[in-house]
A protein has these predicted regions:
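Class I S-adenosyl-L-methionine
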Residues: 2-323, 355
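Active-site catalytic pocket residues across diverse enzymes, especially alpha/beta-hydrolases
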Residues: 57, 148, 342, 362, ...
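Class I SAM-dependent methyltransferase "Motif I" SAM/SAH-binding loop
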Residues: 328-332
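Conserved SAM-binding loop of SAM-dependent methyltransferases across substrates and taxa
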Residues: 333-343
């Protein structure tokens, strides 16, 4: 289905109208051979910066994974205090981390242009995750259908971001945002994503405890559908399966299960099979499209995202040495995840504070591969950023 979002100010010749910009090397971190790949942290407006990156054959069409957490069109300033980080601060004494002041069609066009460039940078087997909120997400979904094709829409992931808030409003409380997952083509990298149960989940799913202290639950020994002529439709120990159902196992298997102590008999003589938690958890649990990765309690940057969540995305949609791009790098969580999982990376942001925080986080890692800080702003590096180098 062909879709298009129509709004005022929509540019029909995006690629032709975006200027490129020179990237000047500011500082190298770590040492390696000159002709080896260096990860890139770039200060500047991501639009002309990405246009410049398109001129490099080792980047254009080579990015395996894009994750972006763009501004949400909140019409607010996000600030950082000296002793704390605030998601939204009204104090003029705090340093501005970034401004999220674009709204309406202006915001949509801002994001659309960047999505078009990101598609150009993506490899044919690459994919993109766009993290957005519930207010703008549905408009962005239509934009992405237009750019990437509705046939390449993979998932709308719900992310539980916080605990329920106890305040009154005319409507339901909001504890989630969304991640739109698209591929560039049908042939995209997918390694699957699996999860393990928490202790609380196991206690809820396996509420019973046997004499040896093992947690278990029970399930019916019969299944839907009658089997009148087969062995699973016959009486076992004088008991017929309920009407319209059959035994899950033939009588000889039921006898074996009972000898092994894997059948629990109720006071009324109803048999049920025991399922033990310690055996069940050995199975891989396929991750679904509702995630609970809450924001860090003490973020180093406003809107900082959960590192475990980014690792899930990086592991599922890229392989070692693949190139990962985040053009709204923020606190650098995508880059940290890529670095720790052995991927190459490019991070771009126009906030001096974002670059500062990302640098500190990267250099705090026990091991970090060589990377280069570039200035792609077209202006001298801000003094606040010069002071931390």
């Amino acid at each position: 289905m062909d879709v298009e979002l129509v709004y005022k100010g929509k540019d029909k010749e995006v690629l032709a109208n975006i200027p490129s910009i020179s990237l000047s090397e500011v500082k190298r971190f770590g040492s390696s051979l000159l002709d080896e790949w260096h990860n890139m942290l770039i200060f500047g407006d991501n639009l002309p910066v990405m246009k410049t990156l398109m001129s490099r054959s080792d980047i254009k069409g080579q990015v395996r994974l894009v994750y972006i957490d763009p501004p949400f069109s909140t019409n607010q300033e996000f600030r950082v205090g000296v002793s704390r980080t605030s998601t939204v601060s009204s104090s003029r004494e705090d340093q501005t981390a970034y401004q999220d002041l674009l709204v309406g069609s202006e915001y949509l066009e801002f994001l659309r242009k960047r999505l078009i460039l990101l598609k150009e940078l993506l490899a044919d087997d690459g994919s993109i995750y766009v993290h957005i909120d519930w207010k703008m997400g549905h408009y962005v979904k239509v934009l992405m259908d237009e750019i990437f094709g509705q046939e390449h829409f993979i998932n709308d992931i719900t992310r539980i971001k916080c605990n329920p808030k106890n305040f009154k409003r005319k409507g339901y409380g909001n504890i989630k945002d969304m991640i739109l997952f698209y591929s560039k083509t049908d042939n995209f990298v997918w390694n699957g994503s699996y999860m393990s149960y928490t202790k609380q989940q196991l206690e809820r799913l396996f509420p019973k405890v046997d004499k040896d202290g093992r947690r278990y639950t029970t399930t019916p020994l019969h299944a839907p559908g009658e089997t009148k002529n087969g062995p699973t439709g016959q009486p076992w120990r004088g008991i017929l399966p309920p009407k319209g159902r059959h035994w899950r196992y033939p009588p000889e298997v039921l006898e074996q299960l009972d000898k092994q102590g894997l059948i629990e008999w109720s006071k009324t003589g109803n048999p049920r099979k025991k399922i033990y938690a310690d055996e069940y958890v050995k199975k891989k649990i396929y991750r679904q499209d509702i995630w609970e990765f809450k924001d860090p309690q003490y973020p180093s940057y406003p809107t900082e995202k959960n590192l475990k969540m980014l690792k899930v995305i990086v592991e599922a949609s890229s392989n070692k040495e693949d190139l990962v791009l985040d053009c709204f790098a923020g606190s650098g969580t995508t880059l940290i995840a890529a670095e720790q999982l052995g991927r190459r990376w490019i991070g771009i942001d126009n906030s001096p504070k974002a670059i500062e925080v990302t640098l500190k986080r990267l250099l705090a890692l026990k091991k970090v591969r060589p990377f280069i800080l570039y200035n792609g702003s077209g202006e001298p590096l801000p003094k606040t950023l010069q002071e931390v180098l």
